[in-house]
Amino acid sequence: MGKQKKTRKYATMKRMLSLRDQRLKEKDRLKPKKKEKKDPSALKEREVPQHPSCLFFQYNTQLGPPYHILVDTNFINFSIKAKLDLVQSMMDCLYAKCIPCITDCVMAEIEKLGQKYRVALRIAKDPRFERLPCTHKGTYADDCLVQRVTQHKCYIVATVDRDLKRRIRKIPGVPIMYISNHRYNIERMPDDYGAPRF
């Protein structure tokens, strides 16, 4: 038996005229886009983000005792691992009264971690912690912390996460608290606060 030839049936595909075809009337024809020539002498407009008046260059005048410290999920976990009391260690680091703050997103993140991190959840529910409500959608804590710190420059961010630290370093005037050598340390503080470095 021979092989059957597959012939293309005529007019199966609808033939369309291009919108630039010469056979179309002038009014129906698509006009070619003209490229706008850029004037090299014209001033270029740029959107520069406005910095708040509380900043004097990198110096943040809004920071002062009692310090409000935004706590990240992994900061609580690493503190438990290093056997550090959160509030007491913060006070030892800054030599002043500290109010640890925890957002709804961080709380939800700790709850999602499950039974293994129940100690972290118990610490997060401590009455000494100030609870900050979140109004945005989603429960990704890193974005929440970065957004909150960008809006209000009165916080210190406590985290051990490298990516979050990198993101916060781009925001001027926001100090970062981290754990090193089984003690809390602070980075980018306006005055010489913080535990001595070894």
Curated annotation (Swiss-Prot):
GO molecular function: RNA binding
Classification via InterPro entries: Fcf1/Utp23, Fcf1_PIN, PIN-like_dom_sf, PIN_dom
One Gene Ontology biological process: endonucleolytic cleavage in 5'-ETS of tricistronic rRNA transcript (SSU-rRNA, 5.8S rRNA, LSU-rRNA)
Cellular component per GO, a single term: nucleoplasm
Primary location recorded for the protein, binned into one broad class: nucleus
UniProt-listed Gene3D superfamilies: 5'-nuclease
PINc domain sequence ranges: 67-166
Residue ranges of the region described as Disordered: 22-47
Pfam families, per database record: Fcf1
Localization terms from the record: Nucleus, Nucleolus
Family per record: Belongs to the UTP23/FCF1 family. FCF1 subfamily.
Protein name stated in the entry: rRNA-processing protein FCF1 homolog
